[in-house]
Amino acid sequence: HLAEFCDAAGFRTCIVSGERKHKFEMLRFVVGPDDRAVPDIEEKLPGRGLWLGAERQLLDAACKNNLFGKRVRREVETKNDLVFLVEALLSKKCIELLQMARCSGALTAGASEVRECLSCGVVGLLVLASDGAPTGLRKITALAEGVPVRSVLTSDELGLVLGRQRLVNALVETGRLAERLDRELGRLAGFRKD
């Protein structure tokens, strides 16, 4: 999916690794008026953007080595909980996108409903709870041949989408919402991998 969106203008350089990636795989930060590093998940805040690969260890390194301050040539404060703040913001964004899919009728939730959609050829993005039972996840993944699968959010987080206590399986129909959700889940995965 990412190759469809990549153009020369969409690439940024990570301030930690120096690696050049598409901004869909990165996180933007700006320095606020109080000289603090502020995550810009929506990429809309004013100011010079400082880009990092969407990975926990890269943000840790940027904070530890004061790379935000070095890039803007002044003292920049980074909160101790910046990594957790970014993870929470990305998780919230993913849940919001799933709720938008639900409101627009593009979300199918529940194991039997998702299985039925997959067997009928409805494709999109399969979202599975990261803490779901391995046997059940394997069964549903086997039906999803050729369908992108993300397993980043917990069942409790997925449950928030429908007001349930838990949700393990969800399918977002092909479209812009599925593409945006895939991007955000990919960025969140960089903060949740072991």
What are these language model-derived features?
Residues 145-189:
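Short basic, glycine-rich beta-strand/loop surfaces that mediate nucleic-acid
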